[in-house]
Amino acid sequence: YRAFFTFGKTTDTLDSFGVLVEEKDFVFDKDAMKNALKSLEGVQMQIPPAYSALSVNGVRAYTLARKGVSPDLPPRRVEIYSLDLVRQVEEKVFCIDIECSGGTYVRSICRDVAQKLGTVGYMSGLIRIASGKFSTENACTLKEVEENPESCVLPLTEPLNEFPETIVEDRFYKDLSNGVKIPTN
């Protein structure tokens, strides 16, 4: 991911769509920022944001949060492979590159970095620059799509090449079509 973190203020959703709930002083110190980012690399237990799709007793956390109820969300195991400061965009806005495991909340990373810096923060922007073997580096530009769309379309089998082929018995077709787990061997 390429994320944009704004420090010195935060919102109820930990992103730019939320309501401002707190402001706190923030003065940029490059060494402190790099140390805060480095300290979050590795395996950790991360507390998800209150505004998330996780279920709490069958109810989405964001539903509870919208009603003013703080959902009790247990920490989840995540791994942050790297957190790199790319550049300072504005006085209190920073561009950060993040490589992390699935299930990691970038909004929570921002909150946690801010806490380590003695302030508050929210995620003011997010771009997914890679997913699996797909990345923005090998993506077509809009101009390329307009000029030669066929050259920008991958075969349907391309996204699945990294997975082993599995032959499924006919009797499992309906279950598989409906997303039900089926036995494999």
Give residue spans per PLM region.
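Extended alpha-helical targeting/anchoring segments
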Residues: 52, 56-81
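Acidic, low-complexity central loop/insert segments
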Residues: 1-45
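Short, conserved beta-turn/loop elements at beta-strand boundaries and strand-helix junctions
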Residues: 11, 42, 73-74, 87-91, ...
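Residue-level signal for inorganic ion chemistry
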Residues: 3, 58, 109, 176
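Short, acidic (Asp/Glu-rich) active-site segment that either coordinates a divalent metal cofactor
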Residues: 1-15, 72-73, 110, 119-125
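Accessory RNA 3′-end/elbow-binding domains used by RNA modification enzymes
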Residues: 4-6, 31-35, 93, 97, ...
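The conserved catalytic core of RNA pseudouridine synthases
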Residues: 71-118
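Short, surface-exposed recognition loops or helix-turn segments adjacent to catalytic cores
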Residues: 47-57, 125-130
